[in-house]
């Protein structure tokens, strides 16, 4: 049992709410922040507040952005005939690192997960359907290769095929049960190259 002042305990609790941060790590982060010079703490707090206040979702793809549309959607050099569907904005960063994909993206902000009570209406599928037009030739489904990701991929294929668009799935160079965020660049590159039609 720790005997920290209430303000320290509160900060530990807030850090512990972050994904992947347990009590011990939250405690270390809190103590580190308390040892920083006041101006650095203020900069850190201001950066959090500014990011939360200015960052929004792109109205086209759902990526994080500070201007709408985002830098990718407004880039005239991107191939708008290909849309890569991903689960979260962080997956865009993973795919952009390999510098082999020049299409656009669509962020679902989740996956279909009946066990978690998330159905198709709980993810950004309506936005994807709105984007399908005569200019879109292919939709690459790059959801994670786990049960929820596969279920989501199959559902997307089912709703898009009647619209006459080619639907492909990234190859499984990404390990089953893994996340795109943790895949290395070569694995992601091979997964994109080896995508298959659904």
Swiss-Prot record:
InterPro entries: DNA_Rcmb_RecR, Rcmb_RecR, Rcmb_RecR_Znf, TOPRIM_dom, TOPRIM_RecR. Residues 81-175 form the Toprim domain. GO terms for molecular function: DNA binding; zinc ion binding. Disulfide bonds: none annotated. Keywords: DNA damage, DNA recombination, DNA repair, Metal-binding, Zinc, Zinc-finger. GO terms for biological process: DNA recombination; DNA repair. A zinc finger (C4-type) spans 58-73. Gene3D superfamilies: 3.30.60.80, 3.40.1360.10, 6.10.250.240, RecR Domain 1. It holds the Pfam family RecR_HhH. Belongs to the RecR family. NCBIfam families: recR. HAMAP family: RecR. PANTHER family: RECOMBINATION PROTEIN RECR (PTHR30446:SF0). This is Recombination protein RecR. It comes from Clostridium novyi (strain NT). The lineage of its organism: Bacteria, Bacillati, Bacillota, Clostridia, Eubacteriales.
């Amino acid at each position: 049992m720790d005997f920290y002042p209430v303000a320290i305990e509160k900060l530990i609790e807030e850090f512990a709410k972050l994904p992947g941060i347990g009590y011990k790590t939250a405690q270390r982060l809190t103590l580190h922040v308390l040892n920083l010079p006041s101006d650095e703490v203020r900069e850190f707090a201001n950066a959090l507040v500014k990011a939360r206040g200015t960052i929004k979702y792109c109205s086209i793809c759902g990526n994080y952005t500070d201007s709408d549309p985002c830098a990718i959607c407004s880039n005239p050099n991107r191939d708008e005939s290909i849309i890569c569907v991903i689960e979260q904005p962080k997956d865009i960063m993973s795919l952009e690192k390999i510098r082999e994909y020049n299409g656009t993206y669509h962020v679902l902000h989740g996956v279909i997960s009946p066990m978690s009570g998330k159905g198709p209406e709980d993810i950004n599928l309506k936005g994807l359907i709105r984007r399908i037009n005569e200019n879109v030739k292919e939709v690459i489904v790059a959801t994670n290769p786990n049960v929820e990701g596969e279920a989501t991929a199959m559902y997307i294929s089912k709703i898009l095929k009647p619209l006459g668009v080619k639907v492909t799935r990234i190859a499984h160079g990404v390990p089953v049960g893994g996340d795109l965020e943790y895949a290395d660049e070569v694995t992601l590159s091979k997964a994109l190259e080896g995508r298959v039609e659904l």
